[in-house]
Amino acid sequence: TFVQITKTYDPEHHGDHHGKVAYGFPVPESVSADTEEEFITPIAVRLASANPALGPKNAAKCTTCHAFEKGGAVKLGPALWNIVGTDIAAAEGFAYSGALSGIEGAWTAEALDGFLLKPKAWAPGTKMGFAGLKDDEDRANLIAWMFQQADAPMAL
């Protein structure tokens, strides 16, 4: 593909230059996949329309390794009751990888969204074997539900 800009009108000069290329430059046919970023609607926007009632459906993928109920046991992964708002890598009874132990902050909606999208990209070296939950709405529904899985549920 080639983009060109032509001079179509010049009030001071008239002649045979109309329609001639004034400046041209090549444009790549496509952008390679490694330079193209996918836009993801911010989790705060998606949470506004999220349906927490659909969270358990998405959480079913997680229950092999995690318990969501109050008093749930540590399995291959930490129990997730009361996890929202707590420090990352701080759930009792679970030995976290250095990948998560080295991350400062709390499990916010933004942190959960990034981790659940691509755990190994968000926390390189994590022990979590799950590839990620790619659907943006599914992640929002799951996170909205996770906010409710607590002794004192946090506001979205």
Across the structure, where does each feature detected by a protein language model lie?
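Electrostatic cytochrome c docking/interface patches
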Residues: F25-A59
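The canonical Cys-X-X-Cys-His
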Residues: G55, A59-E69, L142-M146
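N-terminal export/targeting leaders of redox proteins
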Residues: T1-E38, M154-L156
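N-terminal post-signal-peptidase region of extra-cytosolic proteins
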Residues: I43-S49, T63-A67, A95-Y96
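C-terminal capping alpha-helices of c-type cytochrome domains
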Residues: T1-T6, D10, A106-L156
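Gly/Gly-Pro-rich "capping" loops immediately C-terminal to redox-active cysteine motifs
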Residues: P56, K70-A109, G129-G132
